[in-house]
Amino acid sequence: MQSIKQLLYGLAIFVTLFAVCPVQAAIVVGGEDGWTFSTDGNVNLFMRYTTADDRPDNVHSAFYTLSDDEESFRMRSGFLPGVLAFNVKSPTMAGLDMGARVGFYPNPQNANTKNSFNTQIDLREIFFTVDGNFGQFLVGKALSLFQGQNALTGMTLFGFGIEGSVSGGGATLGNIGYGYIYPQFNAQVRYTTPEFHGFKLAVAAYDPSQIVGSGVNMAGTVVEPAATETKTPRWEAELSYAGLYADGDGNVKSWLSGLHQTADFTDGGDVTAWGVAGGVLVGYKGYELVASGFSGEGLGSTLMLDSDSLDYTGEEREGYGYLLQGTYTFANRFGNTKLGIAYGANRMDETSAEKAVRDAIGNGELKQQDVITVGVYHDLNPNLKLVAEYNLANVEWFNGGDQEVDIISVGTFFMW
């Protein structure tokens, strides 16, 4: 009880310090018996200008990632929203190290309106961990394993990438739908093994998701079949490796992840979503190359599982994607500068039902989304970052329709 009182007292001190010293980089408050309380986060804002071609007629996507015939300027967050996270860590007790994290992810912009009273605050993280010589258990809401590293190793993590909705109040998409599918933050129970010669294995059971589709039928009507009955958890796993070479001048990171989940329709029948993903990162001095990709069935094109994972008949759609990236980071008198170029693409296969509709009425379902990104990411110091990006995106549909969008963005981060 005394430790809890000290922790609450420390929290009160922290709030006071944070209110009067908002630019202090790292604040850690300690209590009695080894308890600690800390915070980390960022505030970011981007200015961006977008020009978009007309969206073709007679095409369908469950989630349109590009604007339609529009020139637009906005000020908004980048791929990362703002972050304000709180961390609590206990002293070691009986060989166990325990901690918890709660992360709030707000966005600075309204939904393209002057007045807004529901600006998005995304509670992405709320979990605790228990570490010991057996490895680690994580319980709560955190980034999912499947394709998690694909997203975290992309250079648009601290950039802008694809915008999604021009009038949106949330964060941008980065390379979501254009190199990987969004792994999302989900409720889970995860076990991670101790490191063994650079290798780790993580296995997790997740709160399952309904598996949803979207497509145009023979009558030209959009149908959205949904398998909503979930009787077992979703399972995800990741095998990863991290190591150094060339006397520490080089680093290597690789990963392989997988997903499996089933769901039933209320009127009978079931669907199965599965996928594999992986990648490798190789760095040497300031140079870094990343190649990652995924393949699966019933996953969707952009948002995983609950958007366009099925065609209009309820059949699982197959798809794959990849991201290729090269960066060079160098020190200069103004700080550290990273120059990068990347190409990412997601592609969906056409089901027999979708082809039949295309032959009959000409409708085209989503075929491919790809983007070329060129970026400059400059750290003035460890807490202040400047970013400039250019993204050239293209979407194709199976009936031959296509659309192109240019996105120019500049932004800044303050991080602690």
Question: What are these regions, as identified by a protein language model?
Answer:
Residues I27-Y49, E71-I211, Y241-L244:
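Outer membrane beta-barrel
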Residues G31, S90-T92, D131-F134, T193-H197, ...:
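Outer-membrane beta-barrel strand-turn architecture
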Residues T36-N42, D97-G99, Q136-G140, Q149, ...:
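Residue-level detector of the transmembrane beta-barrel scaffold of outer-membrane proteins
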Residues G41-Y49, A100-F104, K141, V203-A205, ...:
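Transmembrane beta-barrel strands of outer-membrane/channel proteins
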Residues A52-F63, N110-L123, L152-M155, S209-K231, ...:
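Outer-membrane beta-barrel translocator domains and adjoining extracellular loop/strand segments
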Residues A85-N87, I126-T129, R190-T192, E238-S240, ...:
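Outer-membrane beta-barrel architecture
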Residues A237-V374:
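Detector for outer-membrane/organellar transmembrane beta-barrel domains
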